[in-house]
Design a protein with these regions (language model features):
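Short basic helix-loop element that most often maps to the first helix and adjoining turn
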Residues: 7-26
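Short, conserved catalytic or interaction motifs in soluble domains
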Residues: 39, 58, 68
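DNA major-groove recognition helix of helix-turn-helix/homeodomain DNA-binding modules
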Residues: 47-62
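Conserved hydrophobic/aromatic packing and binding residues within compact polymer-binding modules
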Residues: 9, 23-24, 34-37, 63
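A detector for short, charged/polar N-terminal pre-domain segments
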Residues: 1-4
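Recognition helix of helix-turn-helix/homeodomain-like DNA-binding domains
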Residues: 28-42
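Short amphipathic recognition helices of helix-turn-helix/homeodomain-type DNA-binding modules
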Residues: 62-70
Length: 70
């Protein structure tokens, strides 16, 4: 069993009614980076994860969490 990172970026973004581009602009990355994060193809750096927390106004552990993968 391995451990991965689960994220709620898409859920939180759509809850705000934002496009991927709007979120990308807010956190300072490309739309493609947001797409990759939402599809679990890219794990953001700690700095970027903290930026998501600030933009969403949510604790980091409500955006990103560890999950066991089989």
């Amino acid at each position: 069993m391995t451990t991965g990172i689960r994220n709620r970026v898409k859920e939180l973004r759509t809850g705000l009614g934002w496009t991927q581009q709007e979120l990308a602009d807010a956190v300072g990355v490309s739309r493609q980076s947001i797409n990759s994060i939402e599809r679990d193809r890219y794990v953001p750096s700690l700095m970027l994860a903290l930026t998501f927390a600030r933009v969403f106004g949510a604790p980091l552990d409500q955006i990103f969490s560890l999950e066991d993968k089989k």
